[in-house]
């Protein structure tokens, strides 16, 4: 038998849970004929020879060869003395046509017509005309098949969308199922035949809204309904693209001036990685710019140079809710925290409208599906029309599923209604994916019935996972009010996305099989028919029609008949004969004993019970176990008297045999399945098929729905059900015997169940276990890599940065040697008396900030995708196995077993679920880290456009213009104190960021940039008796402050001490770092620094000293900024609390004293006084060592003063030489970088 199921060399390879691919019956009719000739008089051997035709299929081309058909029928004629072969021979036309298949794509309708001619010639002359009373008459079946072939040819040629309707015995033919599937395939390929009403197009208020609908409809070639505005022409599409680019786009360049949200196209505010670079928004922009380039005669720009499609508050208000599923670029941006300056109130109003519209769409889907619980092509078309009209097809659903899987779930809680909208998108896209994957092959066939059932169960598992994720995930308090505000319940209980899929569930054709079974003369043939039915349709067979016992003659004649039967074979002799039989070895039955009325009970008690015990105990090898089961089914079946008990016992034994064979050797292929072609295509009407013209796209490889005819998902459960049925029959037989009191209790071993379950799911468990281990290892690696990056980001933003406005240099505080060596120094203030700084330029700092966020977000996106893939793998591989294992554990058969079987898949499921919890936790931790929003939030002000430019600054100083009304809200002050305050950056962190994020950070920058060239813009002559005044500005100044300084220095020679605005900031609130002051005060402050102001740094070490002694200086200085000015608490995230400030000390008197002194008027002596008046704890030295003093001109006194006034910093070369190697695991590991190959 195993050799009959050899794999086809041309077959593909399955997945991790796939068994070897199976060909059709090797050799077809020729091999079956040879096996029949070798079987002789052994009924078990005959059963083994015919089993491939009973349960499998063979190529239709074999029936077109008269020699093969003749040899097969002649072999059956030699065995016509036995009931089983005689029944096959009597209905050979039905028997052969039932298993014939088009699955080898070289077969077509020409081969079918030739096969029908051969079968017609094989019929006896007496049955040349159809018999009206025999549904299995050969002539009648051939005539019906010819009519079906003609109808199929007409349907395919006309292409009218009509489908083939079949009833009667021909519905059980394998090739007829394939013809039906082909007509349905042609119908779905042409769908939709009628135009779709894109109501979002007519309701759109903007050109962008109409453009999105037009691109969707034209890309997918959907027909437009005649009503409404009609289908846009090519000229209309080009005109829309031109309008979007030239009139509302603000220029396709997306330059710096558009960051405020004025244009339709923007550069992403921060994202530059592959996964997290807003791919949907970029694709939308590519579509618009591509048509625009075609309309304007230009070339389409490369994708890397194209900005993303963005939005502003005005455009967001104009987006109609009816097009909710067309705004994927908006949802994508919001989930990645890209708002383009749109207020939260506008975003929440938009999301509320979209959530309400999507819930209405879900209700329309439910209404279209109705309450139908079985296959309904009309309902399928209605649901498809609703989804396609709303803008949701398989591609769009896949994009939404990928987007939602790649974004951390905690991102959904930032705005009210975002969680509700994302939940509805998730359920709608998941339903649409299942729906449109089932749609192309939907047909009332056995293969699709298995696929649809598997998809339905998978959808149920996904719904359970979604509910579990919502209940166990992070709380979203904003989602609950959002759900109840206008009656939208998506956040709490999204719509039922599983029940509508019932319109794909195909009911089995039980009536047709009943009609066939009623006309079969062999009980064995009838039982095997129902085994085939159970396997094809994964449905339980109805209870067998029990034969009636031969009636005894009445009165004295009946007693004589009974006496004669008992005398011919007494009960004891029959029992002794049954005891002497050897299961699987005794070939011929003795009619004298088999005809006895005592034979059924004795055979059940002395053969079926002990033989089945040996099979279930796994004491026999595989071949002997199968042989024993075949023998129990076939022994004496042709000779024994009709017996209800024996018939009831042999039906489940046949099912056990077929299922065990299925698990051991793999099931033979079923209708519609082929190792060469997955999926169905219309057949070649001329008889020349196209081999392999369909790829694996859309193929289902799960739960017995794949192309290789794998064992069904509940194979072990079916065996247990059959054993339980046999148990009941054995118990009845034993209880009716005379030895009922002496019989041992009925108990079954479980070794075979354990073995079969292991064979069924060992590959699945091993694959999933390996995938889980790899997932955990990759998570550990990612944690080690990304933790160093997030830690460096945390330390970078935990200390104020020093900025030199003159040179554009930034000084990053570094940890002292004591801080690097003492780990416990973090819990208390441990600041060395000689702080170190690392110098870099402002552009490099911006690149570092951007790179940190990009790497963190890319890692979060890729890890979220990996977690989603692992969850999908669990649903696909483990959930079906769990269903069966739980059914096994709760099976009532264990009441009659010695040791209940407890499959260990629950432990594997716990490990996988624990791994997924860790994956979700890591994704949430990345999302809450400060690095995730490093550019968008912490250092956002670095990337904002300047408040004023140099020209306007000069005009303000010259009193030619009023100060602009630009006031930046003051950020929250960093929390002071705390045990978790991180130390400053170390040089290891600097080198790490330089190697992995921005190489320019560690480049040698010993030279200073040359002084910018100045250009005179106005000269006053002595004609008015005034001294000439040279007013110069810098064409490309490092900052606006430099322009202020240079212009004011030549304007004013006297100063009035002034420090703050007329309305100082409230106590406890940090004023804005760039404060717009009146021109007089600004000029006075700038000139108060003296003529050497241009040589002095405009910013000093403004780290918050003890208690606010320098608070006035910090609050009033318009030149300095620190990372505290850029950071804020991440609302609702709970992850930004790791930003800490540097608390200080001091008294109120010092504060009052400093209020009357300009912020930048200072001397080295006062700086030294301040330093000594505020001693720092845990500092072993009060003066820096000579090697750590600031370099520069001046005498010893000035150098010593400068050493106190300006903190020293290291150059890149010096920093590299002072780094000590680290041996911590993963210290030199680079974090994941975004690459083009990332998925």
From Swiss-Prot:
Quaternary data: Interacts (via C-terminus) with the large tegument protein/LTP (via N-terminus).
Tagged with keyword Coiled coil: no
Organism of origin: Epstein-Barr virus (strain B95-8)
Record field: compositional bias (Low complexity): 1-10, 1115-1126, 1181-1190
Cellular component per GO, a single term: host cell Golgi apparatus
Keywords tagged on the record: Host cytoplasm, Host Golgi apparatus, Host nucleus, Virion, Virion tegument
Location of the region described as Disordered in the Swiss-Prot/TrEMBL record: 1-20, 672-708, 1090-1239
Protein name: Inner tegument protein
Location relative to the cell: Virion tegument; Host cytoplasm; Host nucleus; Host Golgi apparatus, Host trans-Golgi network
